[in-house]
């Protein structure tokens, strides 16, 4: 989820400490609605945040393992193989995010390579992983 929960909580504290009642009841009511929505999103993220990141990282690594044998660029192939062999050492969100960001940067590199080299099957596999990632991160406000 972006922004991350610490950012949402800090913003909430700023809103509450900033004297929202000074601007009138309508403004305060709007701010409280916004804060309530942010807290609901934070609760949902808290519940599923680690699971989403672990699944994404696993899917990306599996994709790299599948793509690497077809890559002719030696440097990219080595990066894909190294990333595919990696694993998440911690379930801390900050550590999972760091791994996820690094994997996503390499995924972008792999996608550019696939597009530049007409590797349509690789492109389709990449898009399937991206679609699954987007579906996992979808946030619904209802129950």
Segments predicted by a language model, with ranges:
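Surface-exposed polar/charged interaction patches
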Residues: 15, 19, 45, 66-70, ...
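Amphipathic alpha-helical binding modules
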Residues: 93-143
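Histone-fold modules and their flanking histone-like tails across chromatin and transcription assemblies
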Residues: 1-3
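Aromatic-anchored, charged helix-turn/loop surface patch used as a conserved interaction hotspot
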Residues: 42-89
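N-terminal interaction modules that seed assembly of large macromolecular complexes
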Residues: 6-62
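Short, surface-exposed, charged/polar-biased interaction segments
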Residues: 29, 33, 37, 56-63, ...
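Intrinsic-disorder-associated interaction segments
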Residues: 9, 53-56, 69, 85, ...
